[in-house]
Amino acid sequence: MVHGSSDSATLESIEQVHDDGRICIWSPHGTGRGITVMIDNYDSFTFNVAQLLVEEGANVVIFRNDKVSIETLESLRPVNMVISPGPGHPLTDAGISLACIKHFGGQIPILGICMGLQCVTVAFGGVVSGAGEIFHGKTSMMQHDGCGLFAGLSTSVPITGTRYHSLCAQIDAVPDVLRETAHVDSGVVMGLRHKTYTIEAVQYHPESVMSEYGHEMVRNFLSWRGGTWAENPHVLNTPASAGPSTSESILTRIFRQRKLDVAQSQT
């Protein structure tokens, strides 16, 4: 069956629900590059992530993490893949997500969000355990390296991210093939990137209205080609830490503080 978007003012997409459970959402701004596969880890935010992707021109096909095989995914010839947020631990509750990262890593770009970062961590031999703090819809300021997903963003000004997690990648056990790309003041890892493959992940939710630069980050992800950074040499250029974009206007500072105040009032 086919459905129009419930919010045609912001997203005039076409949604198709198939008998095998896959959900296809075709972007009105589709680039014609092919399909973005999303593995749904049974999370309530999956379709928020999908909407952000579609708004940036992706044609998204969503599969539940226990309702699809690698062979089926291969047959779609996806141009990239997203591992969604989800409850539980990646070793027990992520279904095919780990296998997807291991199989498609080095072939196509992969983006992990929240549990998706944890899946990337354990897929390459890292450890995921308690973060020492519980966040559910709370915002934090985070530093980032200005490359990959964060390309084009100033490294001089922390960005706001919305967090929904109690687990995290353990920084002292991050595999050698991964590097930290973002963190909060407490030291909790907020971003990881594979050193060779076009695989990047964030622990927070860039699709949240309370997070900053979600569209820019997704746009960066969708621009990547192939499975290695060598095929995207511009992406990991050392960012400039100074320039017009590094300073905040007083209105931006007020807006940032207001968002933090609102988030705190809801806790």
Q: Model regions: which residues?
A:
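Acyltransferase
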Residues: 2-17, 209-267
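A short, flexible N-terminal coil/short beta segment enriched in small residues
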Residues: 9-41
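Short, charged N-terminal beta->alpha structural module
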Residues: 32, 36-56
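Cysteine-nucleophile active-site neighborhood
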Residues: 33-35, 75-160, 218-220
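Short hydrophobic/Thr-rich beta-strand motif most characteristic of the beta2 strand and flanking loop
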Residues: 59-65
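Short acidic active-site motifs
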Residues: 67-72
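Catalytic beta-strand/loop cores that center a nucleophilic Ser/Cys/Thr
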Residues: 148-197
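Active-site-proximal beta-strand elements of phosphoester/diester hydrolases
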Residues: 200-204
